[in-house]
Amino acid sequence: MVKGKILFGDVFSALRCLEDNSISVALTSPPYWRQRDYGFKGQIGREKTPEEYIGRLIVIFRELRAKLKDDGVFFLNIGDKYKNRYGKSHLLQIPYRLAAHMIKDGWKLLDIIIWYKPNHMPSSVKDRFTNTYEPVLVFGKSDENIYTKKHPVLKIPLQQTKWKHTAVFPEKLVSSLLSRCNLKDGDYILDPFAGTGTTGAVVKKMKYQLYPKDLNVILIEKGKKFLDIITERTGIKEIKELKSSEYTWEPVNDKLAFSEDKPLIIIEDTHGETFIAKNSEEFSRIIMGMLSEEFQDFHREDAVYFFGVKNWKLSDLVLPGLLIDHGFILRNMIIIEDGSSWYPVFMLVKDTTRVNYKFYIDRIRKKPKTVLPEKWNQEDFIGLIVNDNLSKKPRKGEVVDIISTYSQDNFPKIVAVSWEDDNISLELCLNPRKDEFIMESLQFTCPHCGTQLIDTYDPLGDNICYNCQKEIYGKNSLPILKESKEIIESLESVENGEYQVGENIKPQYQKRCKESKSKFAGMERMNWGASPGARKTIIGDSFSKMRLYRLDQPTIARYLNIYMKKNDLRIKDITQALPPEYKHTVGHWFRKDFGGSIPLPEDVTLLEEILKLDKEFARILKRSVLKLQTVKHSLKGKNPGDFLELEENKLKEYLTKTYMPPSYYIKK
């Protein structure tokens, strides 16, 4: 059992109960902004804006500072958050903005430790580096303190626990942080946001280590559901319930500020830039240069920028997060481990709704480690839930029969799905061994020379075939679409003149099929819920119905615009030819900016006659598929994440790969 107590109540009231200058180390991870709801009123992290969240924490940590000894240390682990903006989410830089305001409030910033998580969860994100680290801010009341600086990067895996708390930080992280302090027997350790009591559990174990420490711990927790867990982990029996105290706070106000130095305008590549500044002053000049007309006129609107700084200051970590009000979005703060230190590189893109930026993550992926079964047991799939989000009205269904399988591993290829709206359909399933490659297998070929095109339609520049140098995506030069032989053969085994895979079967047609020699023969109609319920496969728990191909929206919009012009139509004419509910939808199909959308399969059926669409083009737009939903890395490899161990001379080449146009990249 560890010596200490649990204060059950809000953090501000609990801190006020503590004696001033009594705590040697405070160590905590408060609720992140807008991350989750812990189920009680007045909880921290539910504020409307990040500015309110930061302002509130400043007030709380001001109270904490009064309780800290003069040589005490405060470890603050706090995660960042993205804020959506026109489809491009902006990294808010909450930890570093908070640190800057805490310094203004009287704290001393002693260190910023990077906690890298080697076993971070895989992510499907493709337009930036996935998040793999969190900062630990180290504060003190004075320069004379018990903190000992060590390597500022900790590589500690996430820790699995039996407790239902999604934000448990590992015991090893707590022990590593405490080991950096010169602690004495009898010292008090405080965790003002105790959660499941990890800090207390570590302090308890320190009593039995090789060089034992007999420490006291105070844990503050507002969530009642965590009290039993804390008691179990720490053995602390003393729980004091507190009444809430009212307190007020003001949102912070951050403004972009520059020195009087001359801007440094980087203009080398219209598609993007990579530059590592030597120091804070040079970095500030680069950011100033980004706001200049010369910089913005030179670069394409879909360019990507990587600007870093070696000998950085805290203000450099704050600055890029403030560019959201000046025309740029911060997508990543990438950490580069550099010997005994680290430095940041910021991924920035233009804040525009006209086009999406060009970022090719596939070029730098790491080799995947996902292991799939050699053979699949077909029984695992009967009764499996199917979620259809490709229809106008989302619906659920379940697999009722397996028509055919892939020969190499018995994974279902064609299945019958019974839907909750009393329809039934045959669906093509993607084999997890090659699902991503199939979804990106649609080829666009030059109508002049037949060369497979590399670049998608460019709404900002000239569209020229890189081989024959002739115009493409014009009125009479739309690229020809080609499907893979594997897909064509799989679908032709089922489809005939009357049916396309993925379509609902009408009751009368279904009855006719059962009496024929078709793939539906002998299949009995099943009532919703009557089949074996929602079995889970080895690595997945449902299928999702989605588009067979990953289509570039501006490219599809270009095709539709050409067809509209060929038929001498306007958007107004198309809207009038469709049912009234399409009034606010049609215009989005022809937009090539962030407001654009691709018609759903049922929409394409209506557009075929109006626009006289090429049958093959329409068929491709209507193609659908079932994909097994499971947590696995991309077959192309793992997103490398925002923590890199690269020498500076290799870093520029590495990052430049991510925005280099495909035709240039292949030549390299």
From Swiss-Prot:
Q: What is its EC number?
A: 2.1.1.113
Q: Which UniProt keywords apply?
A: DNA-binding, Methyltransferase, Restriction system, S-adenosyl-L-methionine, Transferase
Q: Name one GO molecular function term.
A: DNA binding
Q: What Gene3D superfamilies does the record point to?
A: Vaccinia Virus protein VP39 (3.40.50.150)
Pfam families tied to this protein? N6_N4_Mtase
Q: Which InterPro entries match?
A: DNA_methylase_N4/N6, MeTrfase_CN4_CS, RM_Methyltransferase, SAM-dependent_MTases_sf
What chemistry does it catalyse, as a reaction equation? Answer: a 2'-deoxycytidine in DNA + S-adenosyl-L-methionine = an N(4)-methyl-2'-deoxycytidine in DNA + S-adenosyl-L-homocysteine + H(+)
Biological process (GO) annotations? Answer: DNA restriction-modification system; methylation
Name the family: Belongs to the N(4)/N(6)-methyltransferase family. N(4) subfamily.
Protein name, as recorded: Type II methyltransferase M.MwoI
- Write the gene name: mwoIM
